[in-house]
């Protein structure tokens, strides 16, 4: 018995519908498995963070002085030593109190 072209196309159409149905079922099963798991993880994360951290209340300390007053934080002056200064002290003074030096004008030549 030979099958006709019409019967072959019907079998092919039926095969594609079955494959499509199987893929749809697998996809839906995957979604149903992932959906509750992710919401469960989110719920567990929320409940664990609530359980591990005790509710905290913030207490502000009352200032001992009124906020309008300020604290004087000036450094105390140290008396300078008289006499000969060491060579390292002279070197430091010369290094940090350098005279004016030439500064190039224009764009930075290094970055160009």
Swiss-Prot record:
Transmembrane segments: none annotated. Residues 62-71 have a biased composition (Polar residues). Residues 1-39 form the signal peptide. One of its GO terms (biological process) is phloem development. Keywords: Developmental protein, Differentiation, Glycoprotein, Hydroxylation, Secreted, Signal. One of its GO terms (molecular function) is receptor serine/threonine kinase binding. The modification Hydroxyproline is found at residues 104, 107. One of its GO terms (cellular component) is apoplast. Disulfide bonds: none annotated. InterPro entries: CLE41/42/44 (IPR037495). Glycans are attached at residue 107. Residues 41-112 are annotated as: Disordered. Changing residue 107 to A: Impaired repression of tracheary element differentiation. Coiled coil: none annotated. Belongs to the CLV3/ESR signal peptide family. PANTHER family: CLAVATA3/ESR (CLE)-RELATED PROTEIN 41-RELATED, CLAVATA3_ESR (CLE)-RELATED PROTEIN 41-RELATED. This is CLAVATA3/ESR (CLE)-related protein 44.
């Amino acid at each position: 018995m030979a099958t006709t072209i019409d019967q072959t196309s019907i079998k092919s159409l039926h095969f594609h519908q079955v494959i499509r149905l199987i893929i749809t079922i697998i996809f839906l099963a995957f979604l149903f498995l992932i959906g509750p798991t992710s919401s469960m993880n989110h719920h567990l994360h929320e409940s664990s963070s609530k359980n591990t951290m005790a509710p905290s209340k913030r207490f502000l300390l009352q200032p001992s002085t009124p906020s309008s007053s300020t604290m004087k934080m000036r450094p105390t002056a140290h008396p300078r030593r008289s006499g000969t200064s060491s060579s390292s002290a002279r070197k430091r003074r010369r290094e940090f109190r350098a005279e004016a030096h030439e500064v190039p004008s224009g764009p930075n030549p290094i970055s160009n």
